[in-house]
């Protein structure tokens, strides 16, 4: 990141009824340690809540953390809610227990990348840095 760019703004969301958030909290800390501005939604977010938070926080990246197995039903609804908020330029990534057989289908929906358990945090940070939409720094 150069001095002419603002820090990357990331929203980490826990959609659906998934009540396990340790991995999401570890990721939030890693992204913050890497110099990113991170908003964590907390548990039990609806697709509309995720999209509204992404719009209100003016994020460049939305990370969806899911362990419940409901990714095939939740992800399309979240992507549609983001489109309704006119957030077509936001990078959407996902992580959690997404079976390898579902990864191609999830990416086909519009999820840019899927990070499964065991993915090194440095790899996630590097991916976000390389793919987040660039925004100019706010004038002083």
Which residue stretches match the model-derived regions?
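Short, flexible coil/linker segments at domain boundaries that flank nucleotide/cofactor-interacting
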Residues: 3-7, 87
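N-terminal pre-triad scaffold of radical SAM enzymes
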Residues: 13-17
